[in-house]
Amino acid sequence: MLNSLDLEGRPQDTRVVVAMSGGVDSSVTAALLKSEGYDVVGITLQLYDHGAATHRKGACCAGQDIHDARNVAARLGVPHYVLDYESRFRETVIENFADSYASGETPVPCIECNRQVKFRDLLATARELGAAALATGHYVSSRRLADGSRALLCAADTDRDQSYFLFATTREQLDFLRFPLGDMTKQQTRELARRFGLSVADKHDSQDICFVPTGRYTDIISRLKPNAMVSGDIVDLDGHVIGHHEGIVHFTVGQRRGLGIASGAPLYVLSLDAANRRVVVGPREALKMHRIVLRDVNWIGDGALDRAIGAGLELFVRVRSTRRPQPAWLRVVDGRYEVELVAGEEGVSPGQACVFYDGAEGQSRVLGGGFIARAMAQRANEAAAQSGTLAQSFAAELRG
């Protein structure tokens, strides 16, 4: 018989490691599983030098958070361990974050943390401890498929859904992961925390970039990649210099404020040219992109990716964590994966993720995704038509 975590065996015979960040979500996850009789072990990862961030609201995995996680574990009567992952986190997350910004991208460090640390190293530790599952406080859910594997689903609470940050999870990892909060709202989670008597019931939510103690990510980049702070030109779509900047890391695609340019019409950042240290700006209508080239694609849908795509796979995609999934097509073009956005999207930035879904409503299935390498305004048919016109013109010149 399967227990509440869809595992064989009685709860009291089932060890579950809970990733405890010190926040209300992971604390309630541990409390729920403990109340159901599971053999719960709490693990907190110390991910960075927390001295400057100890008392900053919104920090995660810092000194105060470790203290809170330890207190919750003591309240629940479960063993709790703190593992030092600072070196690993710096190598795989912080340095990649700085590299990405220096190359003109807008990275999502939470995705790398989940992929490189939490769902790889911590999961391996959970297995070594004899656990049957690793549970987290993410607002997503999963369900067993007919073949015994598991599908990743969006949270019931669409305002709290965190599936965007978990697209890189592998099938093997999904089989071992459990997400007890997937059907809850944040309000319900806090109410449970109060019912369990947890001190973190009203604690502030953590922010995305947990390792930036001052809240200014450029401080991290200037220390690790000083060349990224070199000044350069701000140019318009025709390449005319209309201003200057103090480093491309201060900008992201879609940005309007802080350009320092006097203009009759609003200007937006359209792209970042790291090689030439140029920030390209233009009108809002130039922000809309219709095609996206992806890298590092992960597929957790049914079957093999290329077979699923065929001549083209109709699905929904999310290009920013705060946006709703939009209709799109996924294709293989010249050996690379491309997404065509049916209605187009503004502010599509390299370094962000493009996540695949089978629908746009709550608890839709996550099919995978990839990182945005490049975005283009032209639709595929427009590009093909232009290519054909150029070829015809060239042929005519040869005949002439």
UniProtKB/Swiss-Prot annotation:
Keywords: ATP-binding, Cytoplasm, Disulfide bond, Nucleotide-binding, RNA-binding, Transferase, tRNA processing, tRNA-binding. This is tRNA-specific 2-thiouridylase MnmA. Transmembrane segments: none annotated. Its main location: cytoplasm. Belongs to the MnmA/TRMU family. Catalyzes the 2-thiolation of uridine at the wobble position (U34) of tRNA, leading to the formation of s(2)U34. It comes from Nitrobacter winogradskyi (strain ATCC 25391 / DSM 10237 / CIP 104748 / NCIMB 11846 / Nb-255). Signal peptide: none annotated. GO terms for molecular function: ATP binding; tRNA binding; tRNA-uridine 2-sulfurtransferase activity. ATP binds at residues 19-26, 45, 137. It comes from the Bacteria. It is found in: Cytoplasm. It catalyses: S-sulfanyl-L-cysteinyl-[protein] + uridine(34) in tRNA + AH2 + ATP = 2-thiouridine(34) in tRNA + L-cysteinyl-[protein] + A + AMP + diphosphate + H(+). The record marks 138, 352 as: Interaction with tRNA. Its EC number is 2.8.1.13. SUPFAM superfamilies: Adenine nucleotide alpha hydrolases-like. Residues 160-162 are annotated as: Interaction with tRNA. The gene is mnmA.
